[in-house]
Amino acid sequence: MSTVPVTDATFDTEVRKSDVPVVVDFWAEWCGPCRQIGPALEELSKEYAGKVKIVKVNVDENPESPAMLGVRGIPALFLFKNGQVVSNKVGAAPKAALATWIASAL
């Protein structure tokens, strides 16, 4: 499974009502650090397939979801479990650090 694009319209269905924990990556095309972590998140989405869903929200095209969560900088990662935020992280990080962060929140 690869990362799933999510919009403001699909946020509740894909994230808050998900049966599995969800990592939400708030990003933008122009954001260098966002592009840096993209490949790592793609790999992690395959490694965690069936256990964790990783979704991407483009903040330029979908401003409501990041505003609702108070996102001020990107990349901003939020981990949802049972529809609630259990952890968040701002800024780029290597794949190993992202994997540790995801695992610690499960």
UniProtKB/Swiss-Prot annotation:
Entry function: Participates in various redox reactions through the reversible oxidation of its active center dithiol to a disulfide and catalyzes dithiol-disulfide exchange reactions.
**Record-given protein name:** Thioredoxin
Domain Thioredoxin residue range list: 2-106
Which family is it part of? Belongs to the thioredoxin family.
Family matches, as Pfam families: Thioredoxin (PF00085)
Q: Under the cellular component aspect of Gene Ontology, which terms does the record hold?
A: cytosol
Q: Which InterPro entries match?
A: Thioredoxin (IPR005746), Thioredoxin-like_sf (IPR036249), Thioredoxin_CS (IPR017937), Thioredoxin_domain (IPR013766)
- Single GO MF descriptor: protein-disulfide reductase activity
Which keywords annotate this record?
Answer: Disulfide bond, Electron transport, Redox-active center, Transport
Q: Which Gene3D superfamilies match?
A: Glutaredoxin (3.40.30.10)
GO BP terms in the entry: cell redox homeostasis
NCBIfam families tied to this protein? thioredoxin (TIGR01068)
Tell me yes or no: is Zinc among this UniProt entry's keywords: no
Name of encoding gene: trxA
Q: Does the keyword Cell membrane apply?
A: no
